[in-house]
C-alpha cells in the first residue's frame, strides 16, 4: 500500500531532478517512519523549480521510494488565492484510489486536500503540528487580516481534525484539548524530533558564576513567533541591573534588520549576535558553548530546538504556550510577551545556580 503525504512545506526541485526541503523539515530521516509501513510515499507539496535558490545540500528530500506531486509554488494569502483554482484542479486529478492519505495541518494544502477527500468519501489521517489560534495571536504576526486568519484557521483546523479517521498530535495534551477528534477515532501523541547519540554530552552541563553569560535562542525572524523583541528587552533590563549576558540568535528573516535596530535603541548592540542561518554542526557548537537556552515563543507546537537544547543538558526557559509546558518545569516558564518576567527569571537562575 502507498501513502500520500500532504504538507504545507516548501520544496525546491533542481534541474537534476533532485528535490530539497527549503527549511530542512522534510528529509530522508522523516520518510523512514513511513517507508517501514508503506511501499511508496507520494509527497504533495509546493515545489519551486529553481537551480539558483540557495539550499543546504543536507536538506535532500529525494529518496528511493519517494515521489513528489508538485503543487504551484506560492507565498502568502494573496498568491494562494491566485493559485487556488489551479491547486484544486491538481489535487482533484491527483487523488489515487487505494492509497492512505495523511494531511499535515494546520495549513491550506492539508485543509484543501482533506476537503477533497471528504467529498470523495475517502478517509484520511492528520498530523496536528501547530495551533493557528496561537500563530495569529496579537504580537505574533503583523498583518491587517490577522484576526480573520486567527478565527478562520482555528475553525478550519477543528473541522479538519474532527472529520479525520485518525490523528497524530505533536503534543501530549495541548493541541488535543483545542482540536479534538471524535470519541471513536484513534489518536496518539508523538514527536518527529530525532536526537543523535553522538550529539549528547558526555557529562552534565554545569553552570558556573561568571562575569558574562552566554544566552542562546533559535528561530526564524520571518515572523515574530519566537519573540526576539521580548528577549532583547529582557537583555537590556538585565544589563541595567548589572547582570551581563551575551545573546546569540540563530535564524534569518525579514525582521532581522528591525531587531538589530531595536538592539541599538536598547544600547545592547555589542551584546547581541544575529548569526542568521547556520549549519547543523554550528548549531551543536553553539549549544555546547551556551549557558542558558531561551525559547519564549508566542506560539509553538512541540519545539524541536528546545528538545535539542535539553538533550545537550542546557538550562532552558520557555513560555506557557503550545507544547512547551509539557517539556519544562513550571519554575522555568513565563507568560508569553513578558520581557520583565523573562529578565527576572534569568536573573534568578543565574544568581541561584542550583535551580539549573
What are the roles of these predicted feature ranges?
Residues 298:
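Aromatic "clamp/platform" in nucleotide-sugar-dependent glycosyltransferases that forms part
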Residues 260-278:
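Nucleotide-activated donor-binding/catalytic signature segment of Leloir-type glycosyltransferases, i.e.
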